[in-house]
Design a protein with these regions (language model features):
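Bacterial Sec-dependent N-terminal signal peptides
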Residues: 3-11, 15-46, 218-229
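Acidic, glycine-anchored loop motifs typical of Ca2+
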Residues: 61-73, 80, 201-202
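Edge beta-strand at a domain terminus
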Residues: 27-37, 164-170, 176-229
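Tryptophan-anchored aromatic micro-motifs
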Residues: 41-68
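Generic detection of short hydrophobic beta-strand segments and adjacent strand-loop junctions
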Residues: 74-80, 123-125, 129, 211
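Generic short beta-strand segments
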Residues: 52-61, 95-99, 145-158, 185-197
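Predominantly extracellular/secreted and cell-surface proteins with exposed
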Residues: 83-172
Length: 229
């Protein structure tokens, strides 16, 4: 059986978000305490700047073998920066290759024109994500709250606004950022669907990604990894 491998999530991340569990009354139960301004500044100093210059995305057109298992992903250049003051901090992604999303749109007559237009789209796309620093030790962890990724595509004799939606850290444990034990910054976003010419942008009504990867059907979104080489 072919195995689709999402990028690994460190155990520390799972432990970090344990604060969502309910109070059992146990004296040993610990509650999450927000970081102090000094701790946030420490997190910021370890993540700020244009460190993440690569992205990795799921693709069965690029197959590698690791420990006897096939992995399906490709890497591309990207410009990603984190700036702010440790309190109001934003991760900005510039020159995002939005055409990679064409792989996750179904092969059918209704989506054919959209899919083809997206494959050919070469213009740079930028988007932002609010950064919330969550943990400073043993590793820096931060939550991400990304904007929709918006692009205007020409097809079918008209211009169409297409928005791609990402889960925030509040909706998915697979959207987050961290500083690794090698002091490298990484960020992970889960893009789960798209909407063409939205009627009400304040109330998104996206179509979920629904695609096959190496013969395996997937419908719960795709993970994009931004990382420091």
């Amino acid at each position: 059986m072919k195995k689709i491998k999402l990028f690994s999530i460190v155990a520390a991340f799972v432990a970090a978000f344990a604060f969502t569990s309910c109070n059992t009354g146990d004296d040993n139960n610990r509650y999450y305490q927000p970081l102090t301004p000094a701790e946030k500044q420490t997190c910021y100093s370890k993540t700020a700047g244009s460190r993440m210059r690569k992205l990795a995305y799921m693709s069965d057109e690029h197959v590698t073998a690791k420990d006897g298992k096939k992995e399906y992903y490709d890497t591309l250049d990207v410009v990603t920066s984190i700036h702010g003051d440790g309190k109001d901090t934003v991760m900005t992604v510039n020159n995002f290759p939005v055409k990679i999303f064409a792989r996750y749109i179904p092969e059918n007559a209704e989506m054919k024109d959209l899919k083809e237009a997206l494959k050919k789209y070469e213009m740079p796309v930028n988007f932002k994500s609010v950064v919330y620093y969550y943990k400073v030790t043993p590793v820096v962890l931060f939550m991400l709250f990304p904007d929709a990724i918006t692009v205007n595509l020409e097809y079918g004799g008209a211009t169409h606004k297409v928005k791609f939606y990402c889960y925030s850290s509040g909706n998915s444990p697979y959207t987050f950022g961290q500083v690794t034990d090698k002091s490298k910054v990484e960020a992970y976003l889960v893009v789960y669907g798209y909407e063409v010419d939205p009627k009400d942008e304040k109330k998104p009504n996206p179509t979920a990604f629904n695609f096959n990867m190496a013969g395996t059907p997937l419908s719960n979104g795709t993970q994009i990894k931004f990382f420091e080489p």
